[in-house]
Amino acid sequence: MDHASSTVELNPISEEDLPFWKELLAQQETREHQPLQERTEEELRQHLKRYTEHNLGHPHHREYKWVVIDAESLERVGEVSFDKLDIGQKIGRIGYSVHPQCWRKGFGTAAVGAMVDKIFNKSDCQRIEAECSIHNSASSRVLEKNGFTREGTKRGYLEIHGVRVDHYSFGLLKEDWEKQR
């Protein structure tokens, strides 16, 4: 699949990205469909320690996070993450957030596409999973545009703002991704 990877760059998250990350989490719209909460820079600095190794092929490292950069303006527009859920079975899960000022400009689709390409090209992952609130149609479209298949509904999957919310479950197999390229 030819993603608009030229529209975004994925840079490993670093200390200099903390103000942007803090600002992203402070946006009410960012947290509308996700169980995210505002954090101080110090809390984010501690959280950042989990993401210091960015070699996707590392056999034991499980968590990765990148900042999404608009390749034209070089501004930060979002973040994406990848967690190895089951190293033995080669299954991972992705997450992503785009700053509300950058919505409806293709950054989410491009960022997820670039991340999927990176994961399948640089790791032994064979399956990527993702979930999104059933109320977040934009996120569903981002996943579907990148070849993910909606596989079901997880009832009461996450608590968001004190309410259990159903989520769609999506999956993408490496073999399907290779056919779409």
Predicted region positions:
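Hydrophobic residues in alpha-helical segments
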Residues: 25, 34, 55-59
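Sparse recognition of residues in long alpha-helices and their boundaries
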Residues: 37-38, 60, 64, 159
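A short helix-loop-beta-strand connector motif used in the catalytic cores of GNAT acetyltransferases and
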Residues: 52-67
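Conserved GNAT-fold acetyl-CoA-binding loop/helix
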Residues: 29-52
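Acyl-donor (CoA/ACP) binding surface of acyl/acetyltransferases
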Residues: 1-19, 23-32, 65-181
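Secondary-structure boundary/capping residues
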Residues: 30, 39, 57-60, 128
